[in-house]
């Protein structure tokens, strides 16, 4: 149940009845201060200006046409023409009870779409590093959220499984006569890659064989395809281990690597040339885009085929967009990659649209993100300046969480302690990233992310277990609790009830904008509001049984909302800490 959306629709209709045009926007916002209501309509003044009317007079006309008596107990015109909306406590109690009895906390699927989410996308024959973390966990949180909202989500792990380097790798695999390639650890494969590159650079006979294998691989040679498949399988098995540790929902079935689009590339380039979009320049095929200018102010050229006949990432991304619309029948395609890819993606998609491969109704969205930085403000590296392997980062998270939990609590069984350590350690790394606006860079700081204070995973996980402990102290029957009447009299009860009913607003924003930090901020605010409620409104020691049950209902919905919200983020909860 999205209060903001309901109010927006109703007030927009009243604005239209009062004379505004169909494109008007009520601009409903949550109010920052209780004296200004629970919500404000901020679009009255802009609409009044278009009509040449006094904003306060137009606001009164809107109120005269507004039917909100069931939702709002009071409406008032404030300042130059704002409308302050005070929600009706009776309506709040009805909606809270409905959310408690609904499997998705009152959130119902609307406008179901098929959405492709392209995320993670590591390279074959290389181990995942910290540079893959953001795409993997942000994309996964958005995928989980869109599924929760009722959409059909297709995960696309666009792995780098094609290119000239595979000739070199196949040649070296053959040279080593390694018949047990599928058993190789990826750490060995990293060294294997370096050795293959060294041979390629230093041994011309080897390099010639490697180049020959590239041609054979691209032409479908069975031997080369088998060797290539081994390299892909080794890599994906190791990546799957990282995904499991990160509690990420990607599976091997979600792999849609660059090689998937290879059969499409020649015909796409031929068609671009036929349409006059691609022209020859020094043997290469280039698309010139007026929408992008080079440093001389001329239309920027985007190469779609090199003069040696090879294709580029742009060509593959055009094919991917076409495939996702035509074959996967998607309504939206979201790509999670870093900001440095923004121009590349916009150019590929502009060519896709110019060629008529997808209609305007098909939404192509680059959900770009900033970099993970060290405390020195530079890209996050090892002490020696090397790339940090993702597995090593997760190992350190577990080590630090082990120290932290051992200091905090010795009243847990070994199994309980192990579960808490994993949830806190991995959760801390994920939440520290997800809680930041994805478009900005952020500083990776172990001390901050493992703190039990502030907007962190440990704080959120503890907030959840704290509420669980309330229910562990009572033997109340869940059926009886759901049937008990809910009353909202205290201001703290009211504030908590409203925040609980704003869950869908946060979730819908994540689904629309691809911004998990909005959900993190919501959950942090909810935990803080519950803490204040808990301090001021006795629950188990309430003055009478009816108030106790009513407050337990608010506590139960808070518990469910925190758990559901953290689940959407891919953060595990525990029953005891």
From Swiss-Prot:
It is an enzyme of class 6 (ligase). A motif ('HIGH' region) lies at residues 122-132. It catalyses: tRNA(Arg) + L-arginine + ATP = L-arginyl-tRNA(Arg) + AMP + diphosphate. SMART domains: Arg_tRNA_synt_N, DALR_1. It is found in: Cytoplasm. It holds the Pfam family tRNA-synt_1d. InterPro entries: aa-tRNA-synth_I_CS, Arg-tRNA-ligase, Arg-tRNA-synth_N, Arg-tRNA-synth_N_sf, ArgRS_core, DALR_anticod-bd, Rossmann-like_a/b/a_fold, tRNAsynth_Ia_anticodon-bd. Its EC number is 6.1.1.19. Belongs to the class-I aminoacyl-tRNA synthetase family. NCBIfam families: argS. This is Arginine--tRNA ligase. It comes from Haemophilus influenzae (strain ATCC 51907 / DSM 11121 / KW20 / Rd). The lineage of its organism: Bacteria, Pseudomonadati, Pseudomonadota, Gammaproteobacteria, Pasteurellales.
């Amino acid at each position: 149940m999205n209060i903001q959306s309901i109010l927006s629709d109703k007030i927009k209709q009243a604005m239209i009845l009062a004379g505004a045009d169909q494109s008007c926007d009520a601009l409903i916002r949550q109010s920052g201060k209780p004296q200004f209501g629970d919500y404000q309509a901020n679009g009255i003044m802009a609409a009044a200006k278009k009509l040449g009317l006094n904003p306060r007079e137009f606001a009164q006309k809107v109120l005269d046409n507004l039917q909100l008596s069931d939702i709002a107990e009071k409406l008032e015109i404030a300042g130059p023409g704002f409308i302050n909306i005070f929600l009706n406590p009776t309506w709040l109690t009805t909606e809270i009870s409905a959310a408690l009895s609904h499997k998705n906390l009152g959130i119902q699927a609307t406008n179901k779409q098929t959405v492709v989410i392209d995320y993670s996308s590591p390279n074959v024959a290389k181990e995942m590093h910290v540079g893959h973390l953001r795409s993997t966990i942000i994309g996964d949180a958005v995928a989980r959220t869109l599924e929760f909202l009722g959409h059909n989500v297709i995960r696309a792990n666009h792995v780098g499984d094609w290119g000239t380097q595979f000739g070199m790798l196949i040649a070296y695999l053959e040279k080593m006569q390694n018949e047990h390639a599928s058993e190789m650890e990826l750490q060995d494969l990293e060294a294997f890659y370096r050795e293959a590159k060294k041979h390629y650079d230093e041994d011309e006979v080897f390099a010639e064989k490697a180049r020959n294998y590239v041609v054979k691989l691209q032409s479908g040679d069975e031997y080369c395809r088998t060797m290539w498949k081994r390299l892909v399988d080794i890599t994906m098995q190791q990546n799957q281990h990282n995904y499991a540790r990160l509690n990420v929902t990607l599976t091997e079935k979600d792999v849609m690597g660059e090689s998937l689009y290879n059969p499409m590339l020649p015909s796409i380039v031929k068609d671009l040339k036929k349409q006059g979009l691609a022209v020859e320049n020094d043997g290469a095929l280039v698309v010139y885009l007026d929408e992008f200018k080079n440093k001389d102010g001329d239309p920027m050229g985007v190469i779609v085929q090199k003069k040696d006949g090879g294709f580029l990432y742009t060509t593959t991304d055009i094919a991917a967009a076409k495939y996702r619309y035509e074959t996967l029948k998607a309504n939206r395609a979201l790509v999670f990659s870093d900001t440095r890819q923004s121009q590349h993606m916009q150019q590929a998609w502009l060519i896709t649209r110019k060629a008529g491969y997808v209609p305007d109704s098909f939404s192509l969205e680059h959900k770009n993100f900033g970099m993970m930085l060290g405390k020195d403000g530079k890209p996050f590296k090892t002490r020696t300046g090397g790339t940090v392997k993702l597995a090593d980062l997760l190992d350190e998270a577990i080590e630090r969480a082990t120290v932290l939990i051992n200091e905090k609590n010795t009243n847990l069984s070994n199994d309980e302690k192990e579960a808490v350590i994993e949830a806190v350690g991995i959760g801390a790394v994920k939440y520290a990233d997800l809680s930041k606006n994805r478009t900005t860079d952020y500083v990776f700081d172990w001390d901050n992310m493992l703190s039990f204070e502030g907007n962190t995973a440990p704080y959120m996980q503890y907030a959840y277990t704290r509420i669980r402990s309330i229910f562990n102290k009572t033997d109340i029957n869940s059926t009886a609790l759901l049937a008990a009447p809910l009353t909202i009299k205290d201001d703290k009860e009211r504030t908590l009830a409203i925040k609980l009913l704003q869950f869908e607003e946060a979730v819908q924003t994540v689904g629309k904008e691809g911004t998990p930090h909005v959900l993190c901020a919501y959950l942090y605010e909810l935990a803080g509001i519950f803490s204040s409620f808990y301090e001021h409104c006795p629950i188990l020691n309430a003055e009478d049984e009816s108030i106790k049950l009513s407050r337990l209902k608010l506590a139960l919905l808070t518990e469910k909302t925190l758990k559901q919200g953290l689940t959407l983020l891919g953060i595990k909860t525990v029953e005891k800490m």
